[in-house]
């Protein structure tokens, strides 16, 4: 098992470019199954989850060609449906959370898919109800195979209809959209997720010949078409990586410029960091973060403690709360971090407490952080990365800490961050992979 050894106290300086968005590209790659024609995708990140999904499509018979450093083409003109029925396919699906988004396109184009419960982060319950209920309303049939421990999902014909989702699930909405684009008639999805990832998926599908309206809202209308065609698509920069770099600069008192961030697609992320006292400046499509000795957390107008809580888009993404929690440990003031959407993502705070942070874990969803205002530096220590986002938060803490830290299970970080130690070391960090 690989690990990072981090020498804390190094300040960073220079420019850094965010990778392509992981949460977008997983959907986009699955959508290539909807056509037999060639689809070319630009700005594909070289990370474990994406590489594993690409390999899974290869094993399904999709022709995958790497055409450049971050450019791939996919042509699903000879999908091996026997392999999709095999135990080998189910085993791969069970290891990869992103494979859940194969259901919609496979059902929409081929009318059948077997599916094992997926893996991924251990961050609490992640229901598939929204996916399955939406697909059921389109006409899918579900059976559970006890022997294979897998769902058998079939559809003789998918028909569009109105549906009100019980939660604005990003992957659930994506699956329903991909199944509905070639269903007969009109599908209306209310309480649809509207993250930039979903907007990108819808725009790509429209370029392929789909008829989706209401993009960027929570009310989508999809007119089914007979077939989809090939296209080219460029993945957005990863907003989670952009936020991680902002937090990293603040914690290490560094001056960095984050290049080509697609600022208009960051939502309230920049403002949420500003509420923690972080100075940042938009320069065209870049973000400049100056060196900052102290930063002061805002209070609410009535003087009560600031609360940062996640919410469906355009609210604050849950994927950055771990980073914001770490940043708050060296701020002046206090903040309540409220992780509403997952119940186990705050369980890494004991590792920060061991490093000297002042954090009160109220319950599985809430933690109060009392900032040190840099009067006491965090101490280096040994820790393990429980999931992608906690892993990068621990890395940020270790980079700002006094002494040497060791983070194990860094495969979790590799799932979401491309060549992270190499890119940070080029800015002056002291990170060694062992």
Map each language-model feature to its residues.
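Short, structured segments at the rim of ligand-binding sites
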Residues: 1-434
